[in-house]
């Protein structure tokens, strides 16, 4: 188990249960303070630009003096199209049909912020879906799982059945690339300790 020790509280600017669980899994104590921001691009952006813009916006929205804030935003990108969370079952089915049998990218923008110090970066993972049977799409869309996830699927849940191959950081697809975050947290005074 990895224990992280810090003199400053780490604030997670997200209500995502997956992000919270990943931080707990690697032993990073944190406080949850979701950012209430409009998740909309001010002008056309690439997936990388968009997730960096939103992660910065989220971090700045919850930041208080002295605190270290961790904010992230994840999207699925296919052919320059950004797929966020589906609003309803028809939107989820449309996403599954778009992604079926194809390779897409999962892009997460991460911002670490403390006072005037800010570091923002992206991590991209390539995911290939199988040809998804229509019956699987319908069954999955009937669950609650797709509707709070970029691209409408959770690789760590039933949506993992769609995944044929992955190239890159698995945890990035879940919603938080824990290795690069852990390495960068060291520069903010949060040192990993193995116990």
Swiss-Prot record:
GO molecular function, a single term: UTP diphosphatase activity
Active site (catalytic residues): 73
Residues flagged as site, Important for substrate specificity: 18, 74, 156
A UniProt-annotated Pfam family: Maf
EC number assigned by the record: 3.6.1.9
GO cellular component: cytoplasm
Known cofactor(s): a divalent metal cation
InterPro entries: ITPase-like_fam (IPR029001), Maf-like (IPR003697)
Keywords, sorted A to Z: Cytoplasm, Hydrolase, Nucleotide metabolism
Disulfide cysteine pairs (residue numbers): none
Localization, UniProt: Cytoplasm
Cytoplasm keyword on record: yes
UniProt catalytic activity: dTTP + H2O = dTMP + diphosphate + H(+); UTP + H2O = UMP + diphosphate + H(+)
Biological process terms in GO annotation: nucleotide metabolic process
Claim: Acetylation is one of the keywords in the record: no
HAMAP family: Maf
Biological function: Nucleoside triphosphate pyrophosphatase that hydrolyzes dTTP and UTP. May have a dual role in cell division arrest and in preventing the incorporation of modified nucleotides into cellular nucleic acids.
Record family assignment: Belongs to the Maf family. YhdE subfamily.
Protein name, UniProt field: dTTP/UTP pyrophosphatase
UniProt organism field: Exiguobacterium sibiricum (strain DSM 17290 / CCUG 55495 / CIP 109462 / JCM 13490 / 255-15)
Source taxonomy: Bacteria, Bacillati, Bacillota, Bacilli, Bacillales
């Amino acid at each position: 188990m990895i224990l992280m020790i810090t003199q400053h509280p780490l604030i997670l600017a997200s209500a995502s249960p997956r992000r919270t669980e990943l931080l707990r899994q690697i032993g990073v104590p944190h406080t949850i303070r979701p950012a209430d921001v409009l998740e909309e691009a001010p002008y056309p952006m690439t997936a990388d630009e968009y997730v960096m813009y939103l992660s910065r916006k989220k971090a700045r929205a919850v930041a208080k003096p002295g605190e270290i804030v961790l904010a992230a935003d994840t999207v699925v990108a296919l052919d320059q199209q950004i797929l966020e969370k589906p609003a309803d079952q028809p939107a989820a089915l449309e996403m599954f049909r778009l992604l079926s049998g194809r390779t897409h990218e999962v892009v997460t923008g991460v911002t670490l912020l403390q006072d005037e110090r800010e570091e923002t970066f992206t991590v991209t993972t390539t995911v290939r879906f199988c040809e998804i049977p229509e019956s699987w799409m319908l069954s999955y869309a009937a669950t609650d799982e797709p509707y709070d996830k970029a691209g409408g699927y959770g690789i760590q849940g039933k949506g993992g059945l769609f995944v044929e191959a992955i190239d890159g950081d698995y945890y990035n697809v879940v919603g938080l690339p824990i290795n690069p975050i852990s390495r960068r947290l060291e520069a903010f005074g949060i040192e990993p300790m193995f116990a």
